[in-house]
């Protein structure tokens, strides 16, 4: 597997893939979406962009916590657009 994500010089690509999958599953479950729909929504989010910045160690948080961040971001955007 190609190294995509690192933290302190260590390859965490596999771990990030697992974390991302679990976050997407949580989003799909809460929103009653299929995996692909949740995948597309999450990958367009600022939360995903933050998660990709591995030095902040957001990837070490539980998937539910990261999903909560995503939903807070989504709610904030809905309020701004309303």
What is the predicted role of each segment?
Residues 1-82:
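C-terminal alpha-helical interaction appendages
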């Amino acid at each position: 597997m190609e190294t995509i994500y690192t933290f302190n010089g260590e390859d965490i690509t596999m771990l990030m893939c697992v974390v991302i999958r679990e976050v997407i599953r949580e989003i799909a479950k809460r929103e009653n979406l299929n995996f692909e729909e949740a995948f597309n929504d999450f990958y367009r989010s600022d939360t995903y962009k933050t998660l990709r910045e591995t030095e902040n160690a957001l990837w070490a948080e539980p998937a539910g916590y990261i999903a909560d961040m995503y939903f807070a971001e989504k709610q904030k955007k809905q309020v701004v657009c309303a």
